[in-house]
Amino acid sequence: MEIKLLSGALGAEIKGLDLKDTSEENFKKINDLLLEHKVIFFRNQNITPEEQLALGKHFGPLEKHVYVKGRENYPEIVRIIKKPNEKNQWGENWHSDVSYNAKPTKAVILKSIKIPPVGGDTCFSN
C-alpha cells in the first residue's frame, strides 16, 4: 500500500487498497487511514453501487438524504449531475453535508464518474 500526503493538514491518496474487498481486515485499514488523514482518496476504484453501500455500512447505518432523492434502487446514493449549459451551482457555497442532524454523519463517500478539467472542486476542512 502506498500513501501520498496531499497537504500538511489533511488528505491522502491511497494506492494498492481494493475497495471491493469488504473484509473486516480491509475495512480496518480504510478506517484507520480515514481517522489519521481525515479525507482519503482512491483512484480508479470502479465499485458498483452495491459495493459502495457495503463499504458504507462498515461505518455505521446508512442514511437517506432528507432533501435530495436518492437513486431509484439505491436511495442512500445521491447522484449529482451537472449538464454543460446548466447554470445552477449545486452545493456551491461552503457547507458540511447533513451537519444539521442531531448526530452528524460519520463519513461521506463521494464517487466521481466524470470530473471536468476545470472547476468542480470540492474543498475539505477539519
Regions found by a protein language model. Give the residues of each.
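Non-heme Fe(II) oxygenase catalytic core, chiefly the N-lobe of the double-stranded beta-helix
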Residues: 1-126
